[in-house]
Amino acid sequence: MIKLSLLLSLASFTAVLANQRPRCQRCPVSSSKYFQQNNLLGSRFQNEVQRLCARRVREESSSESSSSSSSEDCSRRRRRPHREWEDSCSSSYSSCSSTDSCSSSAPCPPPVAQRCDIELKTPIILMGERIYEFLKNYEDQYKKAVLLFLTNILSQISGFNPVFPGGDYDALIEQLKTLGVTVPANTAAELAAIDAAESSALTRAIQANAQKVISDLLTRVSAMCYLDIMSLVNSGLLASQVSSVFNNIQPIITITGNDLFAKQMAVFQKIPGTLPSAAITAITNALQGNRTNFVTFFTTQTSNLQTSVQNSLTTLISELEKLATDTETAFTAFANAEISALISRIFPTSTTSSGSGDSTGSGSTGDAGDAGDTGEDGGDDEGTEGTG
């Protein structure tokens, strides 16, 4: 009976341990009282129970302290065999902690895509900038030449200030006196004043008309891009618009000459009494001659201005054509050098392929094969890693 009771007690003790093992860390060192009070084992097993519970408490305490220094995933892997736990946990912890590698003050390394930009993207961008600067410089020169031409035309127009010399009125007055006409003493001065006034008015009219046309053209060209300016020059529109400055000048000169004649005739009409027909003929012939001289004078002056402007326009077009031709030649050489530099950088074998013969081709094939093998190995590694 004693043996049977002992076996039953041992079986009960084993069952209790099986049910309570997950919560063994809660057992105090004096847990043997629980078994003693329930008369499960007897006093001779108290020391063994105390030893088991104390060891379990130490193990669980050690497990909790170690889990606080690693990730939760690492603590779950702790029940694996030692080597498997060490390999998987260390790699997992490395992957977990790698996300925090940029939190320190040290700068993170650039991504691979950015580091590889220096091979292709950066050289192309720099080449594009150099080409842009080359062509932009040409466009600026072209535009500045046209603007300078128009500015010089404005300067010539502003300097257009011819002074009509006027007629010889003293001779006319002497002739009238011989015909018995009493002429006021200030008649010659009054006629000369009319000449000066009409001359000045005509000069201002010519200047105002020309300045308006050229100033408007200068304002429009200043706001244009190169292609529009080039089209304006090559189509002949620039030349026609500049020439339009002089299209309406001749009618203005003619009208002003007629006004001059009418105003000077009015001076003699103020003379009291009836003038003899010979005096009227002398006055008419003298004033008509003065009008003709006035029109001829200003026609010549404006023609000289027009010729000067036309010569400047011809010089401008010639210089622009020369600039375009020279720049095109220089740009072709410049662009070829830039492209050659890029080709030798990206395709270094192509520069030596003519001299290398078949060896160059085989070398390229070998490199490609190696690259292909590397890519396949990389794929296998990723597949294995994913399976694991």
Curated annotation (Swiss-Prot):
Chief place of localization: other
Region span, Disordered: 350-388
Keywords: Glycoprotein, Signal, Sporulation
Organism: Encephalitozoon intestinalis
Additional record remark: SWP1 is a major antigen recognized during host infection.
Compositionally skewed regions (Acidic residues) per UniProt: 373-388
Known partners and oligomeric status: Component of a complex composed of at least SWP1 and SWP2.
Protein name: Spore wall protein 1
Entry's Gene Ontology BP terms: sporulation resulting in formation of a cellular spore
Sites carrying sugar chains: 290
Annotated signal peptide: 1-18
Function: Spore wall component.
Location within or outside the cell: Spore, Perispore
